[in-house]
Every structure is written in structure tokens, then in C-alpha cells.
């Protein structure tokens, strides 16, 4: 048996994705809300140690805690039943599920596709992963229950090529990166990379959301999760796939308060990348595209294309280049991605060519992995491990290393890509940087502020900047380093508490500007005061302070009205 066929035999089976009518979804939502099954309730059930272990994909401590709770009395709590069934893959009695979901019942959960038929002992097992997701944003509290395919932690098998991910680290990173300014239209490009979680967040502040994916299965999960959140859905997520039945969601579902009040309307379209939205423009695009750099030789060694992450070739250059035709004036696209390192600044040179002419581009590299680290991570992500299949793992890893060596790839960078269309034609700005620090708070707010203030700065000449009366941002602190006994500091650092958590080594000019920027004095007045104190050249110092002002405003250290 070839490595590919051996791996296929060990993959998790793909059950049809769940599908619910608006009435079924409303009943299930009400049951879940009444059950008290939330993030904090699960943590309390498991205990701190077991909950932390489960987040590290160590299942046993959580199983022990849940089994103890189920055996504690004749009527186990709904939280214990639902956690055991949907998060840990345990079988539970039909009677226990009937009690936990009284409106839906076990029979209804089977009809929806959440659980299988009862076994001879009168117990059922989950066919999908379902778990609570909670957060707080500008619109208030978020309380959802999100379905996805069962992970290998439960199945003990490698993931199927059409596997639909749950809410994971990458999805939450993108959700935090995305600006939440109210918009008319938004696009979730590739909603399968996280079971539609970006779609749900976009519906919080967009009047109309379009979600696309090449996978009918991913669209079906997105449709189900949207219905469970009380969202109106149009489209046929199951079209063209016997494994993804149509959701039947063509009318507006009743939105419960627990859904997070998703008032927007959702349209689902199937197709690759930007093809399904040809000729359409949006005010915001969010995407975690299938950017993994999987060489053909690796697939020949037995690793199949995973729909949620692999496109069969480098996808980001084509995707980013095509954004120009799909962004309204003032709109932005935010996405996650990776790129190859072949020299000192090679990644900047390569990625800069992706950004379309006339658009602003901001690329933030957050991490770099060496070739072995990168390949190992994605092999394990797909369920191919040395413990499970040493021969197959070594063959795939060797093919990956060979490909990188032949092409001179020294590492792979991970980070964020933000592309912005100016409100009016102008010279675009480009910033490609390495930032590994993080500030407090949600990064999406910072992204929105940076795009807005850079748009404003682009329309100001130096005289206009000199007339500004900036204010030091409230999250900025100053740090001075002095040699003992010295009167003056040798180093002055400005630290940003929010945003990207940047640290700037301040020159005399920058320190003076930050020290008195309270909105009372203009930049020009501050420059004149520094000249009077230091005797430096007035023209040169003013120019330096104007340039420093532009930079400090652009990165969020200074604010302007």
C-alpha cells in the first residue's frame, strides 16, 4: 500500500455536515442558552488544570473530570453532558441528551446531523464538534455555539482533506486584527478556515456579508453556525456535493439575545478565492487564505491537499494582486499569510510586488520559522506524525526539506497583510516591517486608527503638520536610562501600551515633542521652543520635528483631533 493510500485509510471519516431549518436552529439555540453551557461553565466543570491541558490538546484530565461529573448522580448536569458529547467525543445516554436539550431532543439532534443513531446500549456519539464561544466587542457580548468537524484529538485519526476547522488560534488572530468600524458590505473570503467564525464577527458590524469558499462542506458548516446564531442566510451551501446538504436557510431566523444580535444578512457563494465575487466591491475584506507552501513532492510523498490551508501553489501573490478590483474607496482587506525568506531583505522585496499599484500596503511579520520547523508544524497539523507513521512522516519531511534547499529557502515568515484603497487617488504608502511585540487590547482598533490617520496625513503638507496640536496617546509611557550620578539620560525610550506594543528610542527632538504634546501647543511652536533652548538650526529642527510628528501619529504614539 502506498503512503498516500495508507494515510487515506487512516483518515477520519467525513459525516454529512449538520443542517437545520430556522425553526430547528431556534429551538437548539434556546436549549443551549437554557443549559448554561458556556466557556466559564466548561472551565468550572473541568477545573483549572484539566481546562488548561485540554487547550494544549491533552484530553485525559478533561475526560476524568467529565466522567466523574456524569457519574456523580442520576441526573447529570447539561454542561457535563454536552461537554462530554461534543467536546470530548464521549457517548452519552439518549435520556441524558433529551434532558440537556429538551426542545431539540436526541432524535432532533440526530435529524440535524449533530449525533449519530443510538447504539444498542441506548447511547449516542457526536458526529461534529460543537462548543461555546464567547467574547465582548463594541456591539456588546458575544455568545455563540460553533460547530466544526471532529478533531484528531477525539477521532485519533489524521484529518480528512475536506476537514472544516473549529475556532482556533489563527481564526481568533484574524478576528482581533479586523477593524470593526460599521460598514455596508463585507467579505469573508475562505470562510472554511474557521467554520465561519469571521462571518459571525463581520455580521456584528456589516449590513450585508458575503462568505465564500471552494469547499461546499465549509459553506454548509458556515450556514449551520449562522443559523444557530440567528442569522438570515441565502445561497445553496450544499450545491454540487452529496456530502453537504442544502441548509434550507432561505428565510430570516429569529435572533435570540444569546446570539449576539446579528442583524446583518448573509450570502454564501461557492468558488475559488475572488472568483465568486467577480465584479463586486466591498467595504471590508477579511481572509485567512490557504497560504501553506506545500511543495508537489510532499503531496507525492503521501500528504494530500487540505482544503482549509492548501491551494496547490503560492496563492497570496495572486490573491493580493486581485484585491484592487474588489475594494471600495476607503476600504481595507486584512489577512493572514506567510512568505519565504531567501536572503536578508528578500521577503520585503517579494511581498512588496504583490501589492497592487495605487493601494496602500502594510505587512507585519510576526514570526519566522526555519524550514524544518515549518514543515513539521504543517505535517502535524494535518495529522501526519512520526509517532503515528514514522515512514510516511520522514518521507514527507524529507521532500519538504529537499524542495526548500533546491529553491534556496532559508525560512518562512508569518504575519499580517493589510491592503487599503485610498478614498481618492494619491501616492500610496507602503510599510513592510518586523514587529514581534504586542500591546494590550484588540489590534483591530489600532489598524482602523492607523488607516484613518494615514489617510488624513496624506493630505497634509509640512506646514499643515506644523500647525497640528497633537496629544500624547494615553497608553504611551517614557523610560529613561541614566548612568549613576549623570544629570542627563543616555537613552530615552517611549513605550506603547496598546497597538503593537512598539518601543521607540527617542531622539532629543522626539522626547521634547512627546513631553509637551498636550494639545495646547502646535508642532511649530514646540519646534521654536526647542530652538530657543538649544540654539540649533531652526529650519532643520522644524523639518525633523514635522517628520517625527508624522511618524508618531502614524504609529499611534500621538493623536490628533
Annotate the PLM regions.
Residues 2-81, 154, 424-515, 559-561:
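Acidic, low-complexity/disordered tracts enriched in E/D and polar residues
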Residues 5-10, 230-264:
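Intrinsically disordered, low-complexity terminal tails and inter-domain linkers enriched
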Residues 16-17, 25, 34-129, 150, ...:
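Hydrophobic alpha-helical segments that drive targeting, anchoring, or assembly
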Residues 78-127, 173-176, 502-561:
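Long, charge-rich, low-complexity alpha-helical segments
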Residues 121-186, 191-205:
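SAM-dependent Rossmann-like transferase core, predominantly class I methyltransferases
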Residues 159-170, 180-182, 197, 214-242, ...:
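S-adenosylmethionine
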Residues 208-213:
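Conserved SAM-binding motif I beta-strand of class I
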Residues 371-451:
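Flexible, glycine-/basic-rich loop-and-beta segments that form/coincide
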Amino acid at each position: 500500500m502506498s503512503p498516500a493510500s495508507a494515510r487515506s485509510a487512516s483518515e477520519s471519516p467525513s459525516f454529512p455536515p449538520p443542517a437545520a431549518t430556522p425553526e430547528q436552529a431556534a429551538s437548539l439555540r434556546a436549549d443551549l442558552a437554557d443549559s448554561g453551557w458556556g466557556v466559564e461553565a466548561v472551565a468550572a466543570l473541568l477545573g483549572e488544570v484539566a481546562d488548561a491541558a485540554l487547550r494544549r490538546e491533552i484530553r485525559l484530565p478533561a475526560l476524568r473530570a467529565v466522567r466523574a461529573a456524569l457519574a456523580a448522580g442520576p441526573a447529570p448536569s447539561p454542561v457535563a453532558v454536552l461537554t462530554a458529547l461534543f467536546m470530548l467525543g464521549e457517548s452519552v445516554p439518549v435520556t441524558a441528551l433529551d434532558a440537556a436539550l429538551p426542545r431539540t431532543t436526541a432524535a432532533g439532534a440526530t435529524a440535524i446531523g449533530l449525533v449519530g443513531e443510538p447504539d444498542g446500549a441506548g447511547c449516542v456519539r457526536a458526529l461534529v464538534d460543537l462548543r461555546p464561544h464567547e467574547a465582548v466587542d463594541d456591539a456588546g457580548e458575544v455568545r455563540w455555539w460553533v460547530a466544526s468537524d471532529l478533531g484528531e484529538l477525539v477521532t485519533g485519526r489524521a484529518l480528512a482533506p475536506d476537514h472544516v476547522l473549529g475556532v482556533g488560534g489563527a481564526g481568533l488572530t484574524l478576528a482581533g486584527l479586523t477593524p470593526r468600524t460599521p460598514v455596508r458590505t463585507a467579505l469573508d473570503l475562505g470562510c472554511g478556515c474557521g467554520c465561519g467564525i469571521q462571518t459571525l464577527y463581520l455580521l456584528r458590524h456589516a449590513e450585508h456579508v458575503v462568505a465564500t469558499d471552494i469547499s461546499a462542506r465549509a459553506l454548509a458548516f458556515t450556514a449551520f453556525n449562522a443559523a444557530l446564531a440567528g442569522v438570515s442566510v441565502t445561497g445553496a451551501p450544499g450545491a454540487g456535493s452529496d456530502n453537504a446538504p442544502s441548509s434550507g436557510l432561505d428565510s430570516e431566523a429569529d435572533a435570540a439575545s444569546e446570539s449576539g444580535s446579528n442583524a446583518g444578512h448573509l450570502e454564501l457563494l461557492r468558488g475559488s478565492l475572488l472568483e465568486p465575487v467577480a465584479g463586486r466591491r466591498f467595504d471590508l475584506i477579511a481572509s485567512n487564505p490557504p497560504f501553506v507552501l506545500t511543495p508537489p513532492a510532499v503531496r507525492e510523498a503521501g500528504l494530500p491537499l487540505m482544503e482549509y490551508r492548501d491551494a496547490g501553489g503560492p496563492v497570496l501573490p495572486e490573491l493580493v494582486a486581485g484585491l484592487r478590483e474588489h475594494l471600495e474607496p476607503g476600504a481595507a482587506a486584512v489577512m493572514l499569510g506567510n512568505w519565504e525568506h531567501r536572503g536578508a531583505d528578500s521577503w520585503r522585496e517579494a511581498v512588496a510586488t504583490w501589492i497592487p499599484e495605487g493601494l496602500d500596503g502594510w505587512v507585519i511579520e510576526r514570526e519566522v520559522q526555519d524550514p524544518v520547523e515549518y514543515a513539521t508544524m504543517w505535517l502535524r497539523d494535518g495529522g501526519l506524525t512520526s509517532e503515528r507513521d514514522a515512514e510516511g512522516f520522514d518521507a514527507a519531511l524529507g521532500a519538504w526539506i529537499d524542495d526548500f534547499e533546491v529553491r534556496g529557502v532559508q525560512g518562512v515568515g508569518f504575519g499580517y497583510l493589510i491592503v487599503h484603497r485610498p478614498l481618492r487617488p494619491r501616492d500610496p504608502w507602503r510599510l513592510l516591517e518586523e514587529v514581534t511585540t504586542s500591546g494590550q487590547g484588540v489590534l483591530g482598533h489600532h489598524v482602523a486608527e492607523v488607516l484613518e490617520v494615514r489617510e488624513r496625513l496624506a493630505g497634509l503638507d509640512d506646514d499643515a503638520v506644523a500647525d497640528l496640536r497633537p496629544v500624547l496617546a494615553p497608553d504611551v509611557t517614557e523610560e529613561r536610562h541614566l548612568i549613576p550620578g549623570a544629570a542627563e539620560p543616555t537613552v530615552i525610550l517611549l513605550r506603547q501600551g496598546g497597538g503593537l506594543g512598539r518601543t521607540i528610542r527617542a531622539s532629543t527632538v522626539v522626547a521634547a515633542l512627546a513631553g509637551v504634546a498636550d494639545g495646547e501647543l502646535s508642532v511649530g511652536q514646540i519646534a521654536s521652543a526647542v530652538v530657543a533652548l538649544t540654539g540649533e538650526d531652526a529650519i532643520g529642527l522644524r523639518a525633523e520635528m514635522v517628520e517625527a510628528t508624522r511618524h508618531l501619529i502614524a504609529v499611534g504614539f500621538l493623536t490628533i483631533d
